[in-house]
Amino acid sequence: MVKKLFFIATLLYIGATVSAENYLVKSPDGKIVAELNTNKSLSLQFKYNGSILLQESSIGVTLNDGMDMGKNPKVASHKLSNHKETIHAPFYRQQNFETGYQELNLKLKNGFGIILRAYDEGVAYRFYTQRKGKTIILNETAAYQFGKDKKAWLPYTTTPEKPFAMAFQNIYHETRLDTAKQDLAFLPATVDCGKAKVTILESDLEKYPGMWLKANSSELDKEKGILRAAFAPYPKEMAYYPWRHMSHVKSACDYIATSTGKRNYPWRIFAITEHDTQMPTNNLVYALAAPNKIGDTSWIKPGKVAWDWWNDWNLKGVDFKAGINFETYKYYIDFAHNHGLEYIVLDEGWYNSKEGSILKPIDDIQLPKLIEYGKSKGVDIVLWAVFNVMDENLETICKTYADMGIKGFKVDFMDRDDQTAIEMVERLAACTAKHHLILDLHGIYKPHGLNRTYPNILNYESVFGMEECRWTEAKNDMPLYDVTFPYIRMMAGQVDFTPGAMRNGTRDNWKAIYTKPISMGTRCHQAACYIVQDSPFTMLADTPTNYEADEPYTRYIASLPVVFDKTIVPQGEIGKYIVTARKKGNNWYIGGQSNWDERTLTLKFDFLTDGDYEAIVLKDGINANHDAEDYKIEKSVINQKSELKIHLASGGGFVIKIIKK
């Protein structure tokens, strides 16, 4: 629900005879000024506290009839207005938040228009068209000019030979723009402009491909530090891989989208943050997304999950053969029940994925019996599926499994973000919501606010998460990544990082083991993921028998909430460390993580209300630099005037539960 309060606004209407000029919008606090220039071409620039962050940058949309919004724009009218909103945000990092903006609606001739907004948190624009019939969009142009000496954090495609076909999982490359690779980079991406950082995102992506960025497309781009937009072309012909019945683009058209002539285009967002600690809680993507389309959300249950795939179904000391069978999943359900976890996920293997026979569960799991057993223990079941396999028989699959008692799907292997992929995800979101099924989206592009529109989408992957520990190389520095992506990727939305490793490695002794994976960094670094990361549907990724071997630690992480009333980041620096504090009811939860550098932090608790609190601290043990599994639990009484020094080992972390007395 959105409550819009429109206060006195300056409304300025200018007729069709207006000459080309500049149009300004200012953020409510006056720090951000964005300017649209309509002289010969359409361009955007903006300043923060008087310093130029984005230099004059050309933008536009080209249609197949030859119309180009960015060339020789003719202004028909413009309207300037001011707005405030209070946004209710279920299953988000804030239960509610307020935002305000100044908006320019610039109507152009020939059925084009652009909306530009300035928030205290950044700048956003979107195109719109008001034309008859269908429209084919040849391309959208954007040449964001920052300056060649600016530093950027770019996540490149992992398949340069076929750049748009990938899982959107890569580390961030920290680089100057003029020395950046020419490979395509997916969003979000951040540029350090000196006075502030600018993070490029998008929201309300509907019937349209996702945006990518490319540096150094030409010598001119290199000289000016331009990041140029790119988009996956519209698919012409699809084919299937011989495994998982997974579809892929075999050939593509020479345009990026096909649509109706009357529509809004996606929001292009520049989140502006003076301090790194503002980055993980920037709300622009959520604020700019289309509001809730499904109505009642009381049936949606966030929670923690006992998961099979990461630990390779490894159970120790049991009297049955562990694997994809009833007895194994019964054990997972018992573990979930005994530790207060809401779900288990049945990952790949519960049906013959090569055949795509999703309506035929394998006999060994006895799915109806397993569902009934889960019900008796208060544990619900979520099923894994491949996107296109589910989409090809969507209504039947949703109804069949909802009627059976399944509560959701973990849908995997989209591996593209062309227009048809975007449309497929929305179809899945709408149909699963109709049948009261939740979604956890894997192998997918970054969030773009669809979780606001369809709140049954509880999580997204699009992260270099814990699965990488099964096969990656040590050079892909995960502790570094873990204190980088919360500042950048999490601006886009929640993240299914799948933490919880009980086998933990130091910088010197970590290695990839596919069947018995080890995390990089300490066990407390893993625990901190549950607080640092926005994740309302989150895994306990290791095997139940590993957790049962350390009940104090397991019960500690199992007791942590997954949704919160408020989130702040009191301390942190991108690529070095992060400290996140979240409020739930009268209690607070703090999580902190470091890169491979040891550090000692002084924590203050001035965000607490009056009174005493019990602080239950989970922290790296004295020998955690040698044995990353070493930890300690301590208790003390604190109040809002207290300070606490806490040491983080190399790749370390901590969690504090702060319980009101």
What residues fall within each predicted segment?
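Bacterial Sec-dependent N-terminal signal peptides
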Residues: 1-22
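Aromatic- and carboxylate-enriched substrate-binding clefts and catalytic-loop regions
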Residues: 347-522
